[in-house]
Structure formats: structure tokens, C-alpha cells
Regions:
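Catalytic P-loop NTPase motifs of RecA-like helicase/translocase cores
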Residues: 25, 53-54
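Surface-exposed cleft-lining segments at the edges of enzyme active sites
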Residues: 3-4, 18-24, 103-104
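Basic- and aromatic-lined ligand-binding clefts that recognize polyanionic substrates
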Residues: 13-40
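Active-site glycine-centered loops adjacent to acidic/histidine catalytic or metal-binding residues
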Residues: 49
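Short N-terminal helix-initiation segments at or just after the protein's N-terminus
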Residues: 14-17, 45-46, 54
């Protein structure tokens, strides 16, 4: 009954439902995400998270190319490559990798956002690009890192032809 009520609420308000692939959940990898999208109705949309996709050793650009019509939201998160590699080598849990500082904001990690943003622009994406990073605030000042991420993503998105509205 609860599920039916939520579905009606979403439908009545014309709110799209987006699935967020995420480490530590049932849908983590590029393959998991593809299977989900291929086996659900078009009403189920997709939130692409660049950091979680790279952590799962997947390709966010392929998600854009294959499922653009389902993408309605993007989380731009970066990865500290050395910590990710160490976490994978040690078969660390997602939680441990997070605590070790694997994630950071765009511009402070190893993701080259130009090809990703160009893929979105090529498909005329006009939704949100959200700066995000799961970090320990005692190690990474949230305000300072938010500025780093916003400045980098704004500059890079403009280079790729996006109009930035803040």
C-alpha cells in the first residue's frame, strides 16, 4: 500500500523517479546499472554519479552514451586515485575506502571531466550538475572543498559549452 501511495504521489506531482547507483548498494557497477535500466520502464530515470561509477571501475561516459534518454541528474564527484588503487589492492570495503579519503570534489582527483561533460553536451543535457564528495569534514573543510569543486566544475562545464546558472 505504501509503495502504491508513493507511486501515485510521484505521478500526481509529475515528479520523475531517478535511481542513484551507489557503492554499498545492490546497484553499484556499470553492468548493474545497465541491467536495471534495461529491465525497468522508461519512467525510471537515472542519476549518474561519476565518483561511484569510477570506484566500481565503470565508465560514466558509456552510461551517457547508452542511456542518455533516462539521465535526469548528475553527481560530480572525484576520486583520489592512489587511495582507490590501494583500497582495491587491499580489497577494502566501500566504507573503509571512504574513511581513508577515496572521494573528493571535482578538480581535486583523477577524473578528467572534459570528455564526460562533452558527452553530456553532445546529448543536449540540461539538468543539474551537482558537486559532491563524501569526505571527513575534519580532514577536508566542507566550505573550502565546495568552492574548489564549484569553481572547477563551473569552469570546465563552460569550456564544454554549458551555461552555468547559480
Amino acid at each position: 500500500e505504501y509503495r502504491r501511495q508513493r507511486q501515485m504521489c510521484i505521478r500526481d506531482r509529475n515528479m520523475p523517479l531517478a535511481y542513484h547507483h551507489h557503492m554499498g548498494t545492490i546497484i553499484e557497477t556499470e553492468e548493474d546499472t545497465s541491467r536495471l535500466i534495461e529491465n525497468t520502464k522508461d519512467t525510471v530515470k537515472l542519476l549518474v554519479d561519476t565518483g561511484h561509477m569510477l570506484f566500481a571501475q565503470g565508465d560514466s561516459i558509456k552510461l551517457v552514451e547508452n542511456f542518455y534518454d533516462r539521465i535526469i541528474h548528475v553527481h560530480c564527484k572525484d576520486i583520489r586515485k592512489d587511495i582507490l588503487e590501494q583500497s582495491l589492492k587491499n580489497d577494502a570495503t566501500f566504507r573503509q575506502a571512504f574513511l581513508d579519503g577515496a572521494f573528493t570534489v571535482p578538480g581535486d582527483g583523477c577524473i578528467d571531466y572534459i570528455p564526460f561533460l562533452n558527452a553530456l553536451k553532445k546529448k543536449n543535457y540540461s539538468g543539474w550538475l551537482v558537486v559532491e564528495a563524501e569526505q571527513d569534514p575534519a580532514k577536508a573543510n566542507p566550505f573550502e572543498y565546495a568552492k574548489i569543486g564549484f569553481n572547477y566544475l563551473s569552469k570546465t562545464a563552460k569550456q564544454c559549452g554549458f551555461e552555468i546558472i547559480n
